[in-house]
């Protein structure tokens, strides 16, 4: 859905500046004072060492300890700080609708950031492997004739081999005072010259995003800007880098006026008003959380920074003492609000309280995702398990290649094991982390009066009726068993990678081994049989993200 949307980045920035001008302040004097303190108090030989560490492709616990130690020194030398504070938002200054929008956007932002922090290159997982494993993998790749994957435009993938990844949180943000101090000391330039150069960069930022061409022109007037790197900053490169983004932020902090977001101060007394203003700007310009991995857009950036800490300067302050992430430190409490009026007869497909197992933010995210379903496109549905205890549900639209596919932990484990032997071949242990509440939520969010095709309608009709979806119509194609499964092998050969849950041996009543039944594969098989050809799907994707289908530990992986 969001692929069709355009992030009008600078336009959004300007809108946020207008809406939040009442929360800005003059921070120039404080930033220069801190830069002076850092110039006098920091050991810049250690700064140079940390910069070297940050250029390494693989970094370990010792490297992290060194970074954290230097960050603590910086923290002790500066005044503007962000403090670690849990923020619970309830209905009051913010309406229930605004809170639910906020919760949904935080959930989307979490999904985006987690994907960004698990970088992949050419389909190769670059996760938390040890240095020895990475060396062994490089040797094996060379042995089998594979070259090392080329890195994309986002910069070098940095791998952290650390025991406790939570210690990485909040250790990498840039600070204007630190950027200024490093530029002055490491380029051997007076601090006043650095201030003048960055101020000009900040003035340019009031009308556009400065780029490398702008930087090149400004170097004639301000040679110190030559220390700014032309390479795009990679993920988590630390606050000691000389990126253009760090320099622009510093320039913005030095401007008195301009309503720069970098000078926002958030306090417990104004945090709700500030968030309300952010949501107001979002609504006016249709801002959104993009599903594309990479740098945050202006709305995502301010949302994360404000929700990370409920007190301090979210853009320019030292935040190394802040614990947790934005979605952990800001929570939405709607427990005392009746979001939906009590009704003895629920309206089919109407939005109601989230089902057991789904949070409010997950419910809002699901509602947004389900908006991508075309109510008029041919659609197949199939289930595995019993209508009153389904374990797998798939809804497939062959015209656009999108589908909804999820699982459910069974209530009747004895019946499940029987069905596994003779039908689906699924392992009970693989379903323990399946997200509860999806069945009711997904079926409830299907478009009103939708028409679904199926092969055998009895169980599906009962399932829909049990969810008060009698408005949904079923077309039973009523093929013979043999005809319906004519394309089974071809479908599994081409699309079997879409589902890896059917791992068991399945036998028919004559004890002959057969292919396990998968709800998604069956939808594609029935589509093929009805058209007498295998569908040629240009794209195929599940509209439900993995972390909505399965519960998982709240662990940050970088």
Curated annotation (Swiss-Prot):
GO molecular-function terms, A-Z: hydrolase activity; metal ion binding; RNA binding
Site positions (Important for exonuclease activity): 459
Gene3D superfamilies: Arenaviral nucleoprotein, C-terminal domain, Arenavirus nucleocapsid protein, head domain
Keyword annotations: Capsid protein, Helical capsid protein, Host cytoplasm, Host-virus interaction, Hydrolase, Inhibition of host IKBKE by virus, Inhibition of host innate immune response by virus, Inhibition of host RLR pathway by virus, Interferon antiviral system evasion, Manganese, Metal-binding, Ribonucleoprotein, RNA-binding, Viral immunoevasion, Viral nucleoprotein, Virion, Zinc
EC number: 3.1.13.-
Amino acids binding Zn(2+): 392, 499, 502, 518
GO biological process, one term: symbiont-mediated suppression of host cytoplasmic pattern recognition receptor signaling pathway via inhibition of IKBKE activity
Annotated localization: Virion; Host cytoplasm
Binding site residues for Mn(2+): 382, 384, 522
Pfam families for this protein: Arena_ncap_C, Arena_nucleocap
UniProt xrefs under InterPro entries: Nucleocapsid_arenaviridae, Nucleocapsid_C_arenaviridae, Nucleocapsid_C_sf, Nucleocapsid_N_arenaviridae
Any GO CC annotation of this UniProt entry: host cell cytoplasm
Stretches that traverse the bilayer: none
Role this protein plays: Encapsidates the genome, protecting it from nucleases. The encapsidated genomic RNA is termed the nucleocapsid (NC). Serves as template for viral transcription and replication. The increased presence of protein N in host cell does not seem to trigger the switch from transcription to replication as observed in other negative strain RNA viruses.
Family: Belongs to the arenaviridae nucleocapsid protein family.
Assembly and oligomerization: Homomultimerizes to form the nucleocapsid. Binds to viral genomic RNA. Interacts with glycoprotein G2. Interacts with protein Z; this interaction probably directs the encapsidated genome to budding sites. Interacts with protein L; this interaction does not interfere with Z-L interaction. Interacts with host IKBKE (via Protein kinase domain); the interaction inhibits IKBKE kinase activity.
Comment block on domains: The N-terminal region is important for the cap-binding activity while the C-terminal region contains the 3'-5' exoribonuclease activity. A CCHE zinc binding site is present in the C-terminal region and may thus contribute to the substrate binding and/or the specificity of the exonuclease activity.
Protein name according to UniProt: Nucleoprotein
